[in-house]
Amino acid sequence: MSVGCACPGCSSKSFKLYSPKEPPNGNAFPPFHPGTMLDRDVGPTPMYPPTYLEPGIGRHTPYGNQTDYRIFELNKRLQNWTEECDNLWWDAFTTEFFEDDAMLTITFCLEDGPKRYTIGRTLIPRYFRSIFEGGATELYYVLKHPKEAFHSNFVSLDCDQGSMVTQHGKPMFTQVCVEGRLYLEFMFDDMMRIKTWHFSIRQHRELIPRSILAMHAQDPQMLDQLSKNITRCGLSNSTLNYLRLCVILEPMQELMSRHKTYSLSPRDCLKTCLFQKWQRMVAPPAEPARQQPSKRRKRKMSGGSTMSSGGGNTNNSNSKKKSPASTFALSSQVPDVMVVGEPTLMGGEFGDEDERLITRLENTQFDAANGIDDEDSFNNSPALGANSPWNSKPPSSQESKSENPTSQASQ
């Protein structure tokens, strides 16, 4: 179906709606060139439908909507399938579109309850092959209104209206449409391979041409056979059986890989894997990271101040008794640097860079405790003059008593 384009600056007469079997503009879809960006100033503008418009100004990405185009390439590669395709063909298909550590998840609901199957990269080729082994002759995916999001190292494609369409030729021509949500994660690199594939199936429909019903309208037995579904929740019995088998095969991938790598017997591989798993279970838990001790800075005392303080203490000890408090240096009782931690915030503490250092400064040349009883050294200070009031000594207690009666008698 063709639709006219009413854009004022668009030179195209019409464009085709997106089809999973052909690119948006037929053969005019630009080839996949990783590392390039469409530019308005370079050549004619490609003919894109509204969902394939070139990237907007300021979008720093090395490609346009390459996620949709990768799905188109996947559908195109699946169309090349023939009955002669072997395991190597399917492995090459998976290598082209899936990462080495890719995970594929299928969720659906059967009569006995919901099911969820997750398989790794090794089992993905056989999954797609089981779809064709179940009678399908064609397989492709249709994405309607997908949402693309950019992350740090991958690009996610979320399509709530995704469909997986298969066509079966036996026992009668039937088209099966499986509807659900398809979520994909593409690695943000040149290869744009899928890392996560999650398909949640909601419902399915099986379509039969009217011409076939008209041919067997008079055959009740044939009509009864046509009324029965050939799939369960859109999946053939071959695919369902393989997914059930993957429940056992997926945990055994470690054994198979060890058997191929070291050429060990299955029993030895099992013993080795169990022993390593036991070691991981009994291994002591990692000790919590200890907090580093607070950094303290020691003040370096100059040589002159040390000598002067030492000399002063020697002279004072020879001339008089010291008080008990003066026998211990103040610096030996209180550390030079005290670290004050910040208050906790939301259950954690700040780091060392947020700690504040409080330094106590001392004058080592002056000892207040020793100067209390040293009156002679204070009075003989050259800073005091001869007539200074500080030079006169206070009267003794006996002199004060003798002066008191005289003063009273005179009164």
Swiss-Prot record:
Give GO terms: molecular function aspect only.
chromatin binding; DNA-binding transcription factor binding; enzyme binding; identical protein binding; LIM domain binding; protein homodimerization activity; RNA polymerase II-specific DNA-binding transcription factor binding; transcription coactivator activity
As for PTM, the annotation reads: Ubiquitinated by RLIM/RNF12, leading to its degradation by the proteasome.
Start and end residues of each stretch annotated as Disordered? 284-330, 367-411
Here the segments flagged for biased composition (Low complexity) are 302-318
The primary location reported for this protein is nucleus
Q: Which residues carry this modification: N-acetylserine?
A: S2
A GO cellular component annotation here is: chromatin
Q: List GO BP terms, alphabetically.
A: anterior/posterior axis specification; cell adhesion; cellular component assembly; cerebellar Purkinje cell differentiation; cerebellum development; epithelial structure maintenance; gastrulation with mouth forming second; hair follicle development
Respond yes or no to whether keyword Acetylation is given for this record.
yes
Sorted keywords for this record are: Acetylation, Developmental protein, Nucleus, Phosphoprotein, Ubl conjugation
Which tissues express it?
A: Expressed in multiple adult tissues including heart, brain, liver, kidney, testis, lung and muscle, with expression highest in the pituitary gland and skin.
Which residues in this protein are found as Phosphoserine?
S265, S302
Name the source's superkingdom: Eukaryota
Annotated compartments: Nucleus
Q: Does the keyword Repressor apply?
A: no
Residue numbers carrying Phosphothreonine? T61
Which segments constitute the LIM interaction domain (LID) domain? Answer: 336-375
Instruction: Return the domain comment text from this UniProt entry.
Output: The dimerization domain is located in the N-terminus.
Please give the family membership noted in the entry.
Belongs to the LDB family.
Subunit details:
Interacts with ESR1. Forms homodimers and heterodimers. Interacts with and activates LHX1/LIM1. Interacts with the LIM domains of ISL1 and LMO2. Can assemble in a complex with LMO2 and TAL1/SCL but does not interact with TAL1/SCL directly. Strongly interacts with the LIM2 domain of LMX1A and more weakly with the LIM1 domain. Homodimerization is not required for, and does not effect, LMX1A-binding. Component of a nuclear TAL-1 complex composed at least of CBFA2T3, LDB1, TAL1 and TCF3. Interacts with LHX6 and LHX9.
Record's function text: Binds to the LIM domain of a wide variety of LIM domain-containing transcription factors. May regulate the transcriptional activity of LIM-containing proteins by determining specific partner interactions. Plays a role in the development of interneurons and motor neurons in cooperation with LHX3 and ISL1. Acts synergistically with LHX1/LIM1 in axis formation and activation of gene expression. Acts with LMO2 in the regulation of red blood cell development, maintaining erythroid precursors in an immature state.
Listed name of the protein: LIM domain-binding protein 1
In its UniProt entry, the species of origin is given as: Mus musculus
Q: Which gene encodes it?
A: Ldb1
